Amino acid sequence: MRKALTILILSAGFVFSQIPPIELKVGEGNLVDSIRLLIFLTILSLVPSILIMFTSFTRLVVVLSLLRQAIGTPQAPPNQVIIALSLFLTFFIMKPTIDKINSEALQPYIREEISDEEFFKRVEFYAKDFMLKHTRKETLEAFLSIAKIPKDSVKEPHEIPLRVVIPAFMVSELKTAFEIVFLLYIPFLIVDLVVASILISMGIIMIPPQLISLPFKIMLFVLANGWELVVLSLVRSYQ
């Protein structure tokens, strides 16, 4: 047992001795290259969270997911299709903001015309600009109150910190999404009520009304060109 432990310790020492040393050379004006790489990898790992927090993805995926429930087909389209459609629509909606970040922040940073700090400030400015445009005023004021930030101390909306803007934006997106879903539910609910009334008047109580109303709801949605109407309405709600 002691021999095995000794061999294990010596092997570990040999392995660690083979690891090349990491040199950190501090440059002038910018962060160390190694620190930059660490920051890049950290941001890359946070992409799913960033996608949800800073973009229109939340509203899109909630509306499209609950639309399936309204039609009566909770498994169709499948989640993969809903998420894929939401992603492409998100990139479509966010393109003006992405173009601004690319031209005003990323390209100057690549050309080494601005510092790391200025780069992050510009990215924050354009991301915050998008979120503030689609955040309800009352929701923003509520989160300012929770954060104990007096409204009088905020002269411009862009002075509000991200820790306030992000949750206010997400709550506003959820509220808007549920308002849209409520309006989408109404025509399908009417179809369910009409079918249920007809079945009861005919004395047919053993067959679930949803089973009969489902083909009519699908036909109504297709004839009204529902997918195009819903998608275009979602996109235009950000313009």
UniProtKB/Swiss-Prot annotation:
Main subcellular location of this protein, as a coarse class: membrane
Localization per Swiss-Prot or TrEMBL: Cell membrane; Bacterial flagellum basal body
Membrane-spanning intervals of the chain: 4-24, 37-57, 81-101, 180-200, 204-224
Membrane topology: Multi-pass membrane protein
InterPro entries, A to Z: FliP, T3SS_IM_P
Pfam families, per database record: FliP
GO cellular component: bacterial-type flagellum basal body; plasma membrane
Protein name according to UniProt: Flagellar biosynthetic protein FliP
